[in-house]
From Swiss-Prot:
PROSITE patterns linked: CYTOCHROME_P450
Protein's UniProt name: Cytochrome P450 monooxygenase COX1
Cofactor(s) required for function per UniProt: heme
One cellular component (GO) term of this entry: membrane
EC annotation from Swiss-Prot or TrEMBL: 1.-.-.-
Primary site of residence: membrane
Role of this protein: Cytochrome P450 monooxygenase; part of the gene cluster that mediates the biosynthesis of alpha-cuprenene and oxidized derivatives. The alpha-cuprenene synthase COP6 is the only sesquiterpene synthase identified in C.cinereus that appears to be part of a biosynthetic gene cluster and is highly specific since it catalyzes the cyclization of (2E,6E)-farnesyl diphosphate into only one product, alpha-cuprenene.
Source organism: Coprinopsis cinerea (strain Okayama-7 / 130 / ATCC MYA-4618 / FGSC 9003) (Inky cap fungus)
Region forming the signal peptide: none
Pathway, per record: Secondary metabolite biosynthesis
Amino acid sequence: MTSTTQVLIALSSIVVAYFVKTALAKRKLNPRGLPYPPGPKGLPVIGNLTQLPQHKPWLVYKEWGRTYGDLMYLEAMGQPMIIINSLSRALDLLDKRAVNYSDRPHVPTMDLCVLMKLDWVFAFMQYGADWRNHRRAFHQYLNHNMVHNYHPIQEQETQEFLRALIARPKDFLAHTRHLFGSIIIRISYGFEDEEYNKVLVEEAEALASGFSESIIPGRYLVNAFPFLRHVPSWLPGAGFQRTMQYLRKISEKTLSEPFDNVKEALKTGNRQVGPSLAVGLIESLPDETHANRTSLEVVARNTSALSYIAGADTTVSSAQALILALAMHPEVQRKAQKEIDSVVGTDRLPNMSDKPNMPYVQAIVKEAGRWHTVLPLGFIHVSAKEDEYDGYFIPKGSFIFVNTWAIMHDPDVFKNPLQFNPERYLKNGQIDTSVLDPEAATFGFGRRICPGRWLSNDSLFLMAASLLATFNIAAPKDRTGKPIPLSLDTSSHLITAPLPYDCEFQLRSPKYAALLQK
């Protein structure tokens, strides 16, 4: 027997042993031999790794669903993944079996959270007591019975947004970021100092942007090789460490400085603070001699800081899509303005008390959230243990992706789903409760559903109503005065945003400029 033959036999034995071991391991985990959900066939060892789409994967998964159905199984390097393409499947698993599907993965991206000192953001926390304590604190001050306390802040900042649009209409995308950043910073800490809040918004934006950039596939090698997080920053190729150091400083400042300033203000009265998460949480803390004071203050500090990181990017993206949709559909603007004028008149601007009387504007906000799905694949859920569902086996530790984009663009639920049509939610001039509300999916599922959804919805409504009351929005014009066609195209990130676009804002009447000067 030649040496070459011996090597081939040895290699064959290793391969056979590997497959036997893998098969036995899977059999042990799945003793009843249940089938896995259907999905594209992968390769040995690497599974479906080379098939995973990198650009707008939600579109590919929706297309695969035509072949494999609304529950698909993929595997990459041994990591099982479940793709859900329908609302009913998502509710079955993530709502009805939430105890098993509320965890988050520990992946290299989470290591980046540690490098950036972002491990205080409870959206990334593992499911357990620590996560529950943070969510409880957040929900205590942002539940649907509490958000009315923040309506004055939303109204003040929305009027400032309108004034900025009058002064610098070309910067409308930046104005939307500032609007929602300012609302959330004020609700988080209660400071009315505009310049100070502006600094806080800019720092929080830098932190959110840095994180979003860091998790783009291929952006940093540390995502693929976690051991690189221990490489010193001075080594060639370790530039990510310097970026992480910069973001870590911002994170530490974002977490500590404003919270400590609120504590000092409440203690000494050296500056004015209004109703906010931080004020409420600090005032509810036990005496400093209490055994749990330190741990409770950590939760209060984290909860106050995470408001912006957790919510601003998604709300800004929705707002920018809403403005784009209005610029593309002047007929929608006219109908909304007719409703607004009938409710508000022309002697004041809309406020939150007008919301129940403006179903068409509410429908615009709902449709914007469906038409542009900000989180097309949501945040990853993880199965805490193996499960059987509809005759299929779901392994422990499976990554669960809900294809929210597919749900929101299902033609069986939403006729002509690529069309922006607020009237799909209306019947006899009122919200039609028989039509699926996009909020059933766009804010997440189960115990991981977004706790800031009521605040976000109110902020978007007020922006839409105030914007439509004050301005006509139009597509930009070319040199000949002809309108330049607009369309919705988005980034391919975890949180998608409309690609930059232009539009024009025209005051409906000088009266509105005068109102805003009062």
